[in-house]
Amino acid sequence: MAQGAQRKNFGHNQILRPSAAYTPVDEQEVLQILDRHRGQRIRAVGRLHSWSEAVTGDGVLLDLQRLNDVRLQSDGDQLVATVGAGCQIKRLLKELNREGATLHSLGLITAQTIAGAISTGTHGSGRNSMSHYVVGVRLACYDASTGQAIIEELSAGEPLQAARCSLGSLGIILAVRIRCREQYNVQEHFTESRRLLDVMDAEAPFPLQQFYLLPWRWSYFIQHRREDDRPRSRLARLYRLYWLGTMDYGLILQILFLERVARSRRLIRLAFRRIIPAFLIRNWRVTDRSSSMLVMRHDAFRHIEIELFVRRDQLADALGFTQEVIKIAGGRESALSADNQRRIEELGMQEALAGLHDQYCHHFPICVRRVLPDDTLISMASGAGEDWYALSFISYAKPARRAGFSLFASFMARSMSRLFHARPHWGKVCPLEADELTSLYPRFDAFRTVCNTLDPQGVFQNDWTTALLEADGQVGDFP
């Protein structure tokens, strides 16, 4: 055991002050720790890549990085990997690739642990979230009758649906069983369009695509992607170096200079209108392994992020609203369009909009990814119906200079949740009150029931998840 030294998350916007911290070597030690601290609050952490309060805790902290085994097996006609909770995605991909396999769904960041990734609904584009493919969760919790620490296997029904995206609220995840597939290649190329209709029309031939709305230029750069039976391109390695230098590092270094050193809004707008687009090579078609194509070095530099999920039928309105709000926040406009101004007045948010004026200059491409509906209780894409689209807003401002972004993120979350039923990503900045958040999820009551069954004393909660479980927000409560 180590005394609970203070820790910060990746974004330096959350601070953890545990009373005690452990790095157990196996499942048996986890059970021993639970028995030793019976009645105290206990939370697990991964690599702390969450910006939300899901990572916080002032009780006992478990870092499960040593529980990182990977075993790939056939289960009928499917491949299923059993993965230790603390295994990072990058290690998992490497181990699976040795067996000629990979994950169905990948997020941009591979530094996350598997337990952390599924607990917050991590996703890529064009498929379901990672949580959707989970077929079993091995969980340490307490026996309700004896009070002893035990291991539960969740493999069916609502307990499994809850465990697929749990916010760490059911117990301590020890291992995850997740469906895999044979390794495959992805072909990718970029185009640019001024029309969202062109972007959406390209989804049929390129179902794995994601796209970026460039602020201040207001055009869409489309990263067309699809599975490809052809072998890896001869220039794939050169393309990876180009991507690393241009996007993973080059773009962000430009933005860091403009935002943190020059602090010039005029130069930021100029960069997005003229300079950054010049570095994006259009129509260079390259085929490479999926686990290389579908990820980025998104964690190379410290940043903060909010991501909002809207249904397909709300996407066009949501993007139009986004563009107008960014112009107001950046001081380029003083009012929304008549329709959107009326909407804000009906919500009673005129003061919030006025307070945002000229407070924040957005300085990163808005990434939009399509996520298919999930078989979970509370992932952001849970529920049948139309596909979801995740709009990501990132700021590279220094932690001490994030007040403008905080105003922007709060306004966007509050307004878009009411106007477009947008759901904030559980693992990113999540500024809504508990009642508002739970009202966005029709099956939150079922999730609450599973939590209360597996953790009746609430020992695996922090203040934030406790507030969520105690909230009485019902679907439709908020306009």
UniProtKB/Swiss-Prot annotation:
GO terms for biological process: fatty acid metabolic process. PROSITE patterns: FAD_PCMH. Its main location: membrane. The chain crosses the membrane at residues 241-258. Pathway: Lipid metabolism; fatty acid metabolism. It is an enzyme of class 1 (oxidoreductase). It is found in: Cell membrane. SUPFAM superfamilies: FAD-binding/transporter-associated domain-like. InterPro entries: ALO_C, FAD-bd_PCMH, FAD-bd_PCMH-like_sf, FAD-bd_PCMH_sub1, FAD-bd_PCMH_sub2, FAD_lactone_oxidase-like, Oxid_FAD_bind_N, Vanillyl_alc_oxidase_C-sub2. Its cofactor is FAD. The modification Pros-8alpha-FAD histidine is found at H49. One of its GO terms (molecular function) is long-chain-alcohol oxidase activity. This is Long-chain alcohol oxidase. It comes from Uncultured marine euryarchaeote.
